[in-house]
């Protein structure tokens, strides 16, 4: 272990004064001359980032994806998009970043997946009420949760989309190719925790949690900022703190201040 790596393990509040550099791998540096940035290219530029005084790198989504929403439509939480390299490339990048005293934060989309994700492909073919069907939110009518606003009105006319395989509607707060996970299902919690454990056990220093206000649905509400969402985030924080040391969870709640304040907790 290098001195920089040892120092990283002893900085409890490292994020308080971190200089965080946001990187979209695909547009940063191309090591193979194929017109696409990659992890080998990012690795080549670590000395440059270190010279700038950067102490943490925040990576935008790099997972396998149809790329209909710039990678936020994730098709596999456990791998790297082939355009950007391999898991081995990522591990080498992570190791070399740490050797320079640079931490790494990655994006994790909690609310939804791509409709190409294996979970959804299983769900749409599963029987109603079965383990895989309940990974997502289904209905035989598009009339539920009418109080929930449509976020992308220019592109979507409803928060429900018909699936011809399942013969039912599925819920999506974002684009219709991004079905929402069903957080009323404890198995979804377990699956997401496995994803988190995979990356944190690899050595990732933090997660930027995307689209957290929309995790739960409840009739008669806006389906945003529900008490169940706060409880899940507390559960997630406890899970991470129990298993890992000094890891940051940077959650996105794109809400008005009076609605966002509850996400800060009360001493917890």
Model regions and ranges:
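Acidic/aromatic-lined carbohydrate-recognition and catalytic surfaces
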Residues: 2-193, 201, 212-267
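Active-site regions of oxyanion-processing enzymes, predominantly non-cytosolic
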Residues: 199-209
């Amino acid at each position: 272990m290098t001195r920089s790596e040892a120092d990283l393990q002893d900085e409890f509040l490292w994020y308080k004064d971190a200089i965080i550099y946001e990187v979209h791998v695909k547009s940063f540096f191309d090591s193979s001359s194929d017109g696409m940035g990659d992890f080998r290219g990012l690795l080549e530029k670590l000395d440059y980032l270190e010279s700038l005084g950067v102490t943490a790198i925040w990576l935008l989504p790099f997972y396998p994806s149809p790329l209909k929403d710039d990678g936020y439509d994730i098709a596999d939480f456990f791998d790297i998009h082939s355009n950007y390299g391999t898991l081995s490339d990522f591990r080498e990048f992570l190791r070399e970043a740490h050797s320079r005293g640079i931490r790494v934060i990655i994006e994790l989309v909690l609310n939804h997946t791509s409709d190409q994700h294996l979970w959804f492909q299983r769900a749409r073919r599963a029987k109603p009420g079965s383990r895989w069907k309940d990974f997502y939110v289904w209905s035989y009518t598009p009339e539920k949760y009418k109080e929930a606003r449509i976020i992308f009105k220019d592109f979507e006319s409803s928060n429900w989309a018909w699936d011809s395989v399942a013969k039912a509607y599925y819920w999506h707060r974002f684009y219709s190719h991004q079905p929402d996970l069903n957080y009323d299902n404890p198995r979804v919690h377990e699956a997401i925790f496995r994803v988190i454990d995979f990356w944190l056990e690899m050595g990732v220093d933090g997660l930027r949690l995307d689209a957290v206000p929309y995790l739960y649905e409840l009739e008669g509400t806006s389906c945003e900022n529900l008490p169940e969402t706060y409880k899940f985030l507390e559960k997630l924080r406890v899970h991470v703190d129990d298993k890992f040391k000094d890891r940051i969870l940077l959650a996105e709640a794109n809400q008005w201040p009076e609605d966002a304040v509850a996400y800060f907790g009360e001493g917890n």
